[in-house]
């Protein structure tokens, strides 16, 4: 599973990008997106790091298949 950023909720603060251990978060077309192929939800860290730093509730959520 991977995480996803809601483009409508994201404030483009950039807090998530530097904490992503897989480098899956990139700025694309003026919004941050998470590469689902490389995101592993920080499996070995207990919880996704992006969730811990995002100032907006429900901006980053598990990607629906």
UniProtKB/Swiss-Prot annotation:
UniProt cofactor(s): [4Fe-4S] cluster
Residue ranges that the Swiss-Prot or TrEMBL entry lists as coiled coil: none
KW Iron-sulfur (keyword) present: yes
GO MF terms, alphabetically ordered: 4 iron, 4 sulfur cluster binding; metal ion binding
Keyword Electron transport: yes
InterPro entries: 4Fe4S_Fe-S-bd, 4Fe4S_Fe_S_CS
Cofactor details (free text): Binds 2 [4Fe-4S] clusters.
Keywords (A to Z) from UniProt: 4Fe-4S, Electron transport, Iron, Iron-sulfur, Metal-binding, Nitrogen fixation, Repeat, Transport
A biological process from GO: nitrogen fixation
Cited Pfam families: Fer4_7
Residues where [4Fe-4S] cluster 1 binds: 10, 13, 16, 54
Binding positions for [4Fe-4S] cluster 2 per the UniProt entry: 20, 39, 42, 50
Residue ranges of every copy of the 4Fe-4S ferredoxin-type domain listed in the record: 2-29, 30-65
Protein name, per record: Ferredoxin-like protein in vnf region
Species this protein is from: Azotobacter chroococcum mcd 1
